[in-house]
From Swiss-Prot:
Xref: Pfam families: 7tm_1 (PF00001)
Keyword Transmembrane: yes
Function of the protein: Orphan receptor. Possible candidate for amine-like G-protein coupled receptor.
Organism: Rattus norvegicus (Rat)
Disulfide bond residue pairs: 96-173
Chief location: membrane
Protein name listed in UniProt: Probable G-protein coupled receptor 27
TM helices/strands, residue ranges: 25-45, 57-77, 99-119, 141-161, 184-204, 288-308, 323-343
PANTHER family hit by this protein: G PROTEIN-COUPLED RECEPTOR, G-PROTEIN COUPLED RECEPTOR 27-RELATED
Tissues expressing the protein: Expressed as a 3.0 kb transcript, in whole brain, hippocampus, striatum, frontal cortex, thalamus, pons and hypothalamus. A lower molecular weight transcript was detected in all regions examined, except the hypothalamus.
Ranges in the topological domain labelled Cytoplasmic: 46-56, 120-140, 205-287, 344-377
Gene Ontology annotations for the cellular component aspect, listed alphabetically: plasma membrane
Topology of this chain in the membrane: Multi-pass membrane protein
GO BP of this protein: positive regulation of insulin secretion involved in cellular response to glucose stimulus; positive regulation of phospholipase C-activating G protein-coupled receptor signaling pathway
Amino acid sequence: MANASEPGGGGGGAEAAALGLRLATLSLLLCVSLAGNVLFALLIVRERSLHRAPYYLLLDLCLADGLRALACLPAVMLAARRAAAAAGTPPGALGCKLLAFLAALFCFHAAFLLLGVGVTRYLAIAHHRFYAERLAGWPCAAMLVCAAWALALAAAFPPVLDGGGADDEDAPCALEQRPDGAPGALGFLLLLAAVVGATHLVYLRLLFFIHDRRKMRPARLVPAVSHDWTFHGPGATGQAAANWTAGFGRGPTPPALVGIRPAGPGRGARRLLVLEEFKTEKRLCKMFYAITLLFLLLWGPYVVASYLRVLVRPGAVPQAYLTASVWLTFAQAGINPVVCFLFNRELRDCFRAQFPCCQSPQATQATLPCDLKGIGL
């Protein structure tokens, strides 16, 4: 959106420097997004310990962010160069609609996928047996991925069917809305806000669930009912029945033990969520919620600007705020690998195992056998 300056004036150098800085920043975002997302995708594919449903969903999210950066950021760079050129032609209406469709598609895919991830995280903590039996494998992850892409495809069509062209070089890859307050644009914004809000409500419900069970209740001994040495009732441990079955008891047959689950190697014999599994699931919840919160923080300013443009008037939003909000959406395409690396210790360990050259000398020394350490190696 650079204005043409007078020849020989001092504005040309400043505009050229601003254009160079903008193109360099976009190139850096493109490289970081592609390198980080492709690296994490390869790490999840190669490491067998990561072949679980949460990491399959993370793999799809990384691939979608990489595709968004590859499809959108070069187009924005080309639009910026065309706008800065003296005889540059603006991008066509078809190209703007295609880029707006791709941006809306990837945005809604991330929103719907994060909603599905939030629901599965809640089930993994609150209903662990059901999650372990029905939702822990790859079929559930494949269904969630397909559903997220299908819903995103259905939601991305309406905003670009009748929309106009882009009005600045930052807009082709942003969620272009019709500036006349059309119901399609307003419905698009309401749907996005509803999906993101529902995702945070799921995590809020999960937080309340963990808070209510943060401390174990003290065990209360309930005395068993005893008649002629047959113990039954809430406090019975079943030892009397076991003794009678083994032939050590006398008297009448003890009552049937109600509520005791038979132990066995089958799928129904899986225990409840133990402490180590709970810590693992909790770390995954923290990582995915950090991704969800950053999605809200980086897309929120642009959604607010779009609301103002739709409900008030197109010129109600300052151009500086609109440009900054669009650049925040660009940064969202490359921030997820950094968040995953910071919040997930399992991913860091797998990364060090796959790439030993990235380990520090202290970590390499810690992995040496004791006899090698003793001789100074």
